[in-house]
Amino acid sequence: MSEEMNDQMLVRRQKLQELYDLGIDPFGSKFDRSGLSSDLKEEWDQYSKEELVEKEADSHVAIAGRLMTKRGKGKAGFAHVQDLAGQIQIYVRKDQVGDDEFDLWKNADLGDIVGVEGVMFKTNTGELSVKAKKFTLLTKSLRPLPDKFHGLQDIEQRYRQRYLDLITNEDSTRTFINRSKIIQEMRNYLNNKGFLEVETPMMHQIAGGAAARPFVTHHNALDATLYMRIAIELHLKRLIVGGLEKVYEIGRVFRNEGVSTRHNPEFTMIELYEAYADYHDIMDLTESMVRHIANEVLGSAKVQYNGETIDLESAWTRLHIVDAVKEATGVDFYEVKSDDEAKALAKEHGIEIKDTMKYGHILNEFFEQKVEETLIQPTFIYGHPTEISPLAKKNPEDPRFTDRFELFIVGREHANAFTELNDPIDQKGRFEAQLVEKAQGNDEAHEMDEDYIEALEYGMPPTGGLGIGIDRLVMLLTDSPSIRDVLLFPYMRQK
């Protein structure tokens, strides 16, 4: 082993050898359960102690799980066995299970995985329990669990050893069960709306579809540089060109950026695209879908986050980005006529900007630095500047802005969507402008994607598209303060 064993570990190794000496497999085999702990409680907790005595002949059950508590001396003892659904008490008596199985019970340690067959009864205190008729060791645990009263206190250890966190922290288990349900309800909602789930490549020849730094890899056989995808977007829009009119993909995306409570280098997104729709339709879909998910998974569209009630049930606010900035700062960007004027306003209001930034970038900085964190209740911010929205369609009434929106809840972006740019000539011009930005030092600017331009030249119908960061949505719906709380195995720095 890579570390010195402590006394408890040595004792468990000795017990392991004793089991082998007795011809007992310490790592067991299949065990047929009659149900989970919750199933037993649902079926039998309704009866009184006396009624369970009368029904004993019909109450034979079989459960399996991990020993979490153990007490008792002499010829009988109690324990709590934990499975996916929770815990249930067991009662083991020597005259019920026999000498050999009672010896197994006496030598069992906390953390061991056991199987119990028996009948249901209630103790004098009214706790529903299983009276063991047969006790089986299924897996010998060679390491002691964290202290049962204090659990796993080191937050970093919880992330590094998620399996221990799940064993000792019921809230963590509930969070990840709900994460699975959230994704399932998202699928159910979209499938019922006629969307088709698809799969597209994770390794791209060009890093496109978002403003982000990619991870770079190399294909040895082809001697080719490839990029882990930073977005799913451009492949899905190729499918819209091909006639798949309503598509979505749920998958991993990779961005070579910082790690924080909101960011992980790999994360899960859903992107969807609907032909013959625009960003207003996608706004309606987003609101309806998130509300549906909350109701189905949590039973309510009013959720608690960090002590605040977030109302997903009422109609969500819709606010143009210029109006949002004006409300917060008094600056009306409709009246700003030049980049120089925008830069002067930024200096006046203490907005940090780069020298290369234009009108649209500066408006966005005003929003991010003065408005974003104030948007606690669900708010659609729409009308983003063209300079920062290279894949979105320009607004026909004011081409400085696009038909795009972002969804903000609890001061964080949760979704990004727009009426897709389907004009190949305009799209090529936008890509060329991005190349200029890249040459000026913007590492997150888009590359030119000639193949995507060619696809657009065959004709893409008017289309609405949406991207949602699933991890942030799960954070919201599970009241989790950090993205690491909703990722089973978040990225951690090497020790």
UniProtKB/Swiss-Prot annotation:
Any one of the GO BP annotations: lysyl-tRNA aminoacylation
SUPFAM superfamilies according to UniProt: Class II aaRS and biotin synthetases, Nucleic acid-binding proteins
Enzyme class, spelled out: ligase
Bound cofactor: record note: Binds 3 Mg(2+) ions per subunit.
GO MF term (any one): transferase activity
Required co-factors: Mg(2+)
One GO term describing the cellular component: cytosol
Main location: cytoplasm
Listed EC numbers: 6.1.1.6
InterPro entries associated with the record: Aa-tRNA-synt_II, aa-tRNA-synth_II, aa-tRNA-synth_II/BPL/LPL, Lys-tRNA-ligase_II, Lys-tRNA-ligase_II_bac/euk, Lys-tRNA-ligase_II_N, Lys-tRNA-synth_II_C, NA-bd_OB-fold
Localization terms from the record: Cytoplasm
Residues engaged in binding Mg(2+) 2: 413
Matches recorded under Pfam families: tRNA-synt_2, tRNA_anti-codon
Cited PROSITE patterns: AA_TRNA_LIGASE_II
Cited PANTHER family: LYSINE--TRNA LIGASE, CHLOROPLASTIC_MITOCHONDRIAL, LYSYL-TRNA SYNTHETASE
Protein family membership: Belongs to the class-II aminoacyl-tRNA synthetase family.
Protein name, per record: Lysine--tRNA ligase
Organism: Staphylococcus aureus (strain MSSA476)
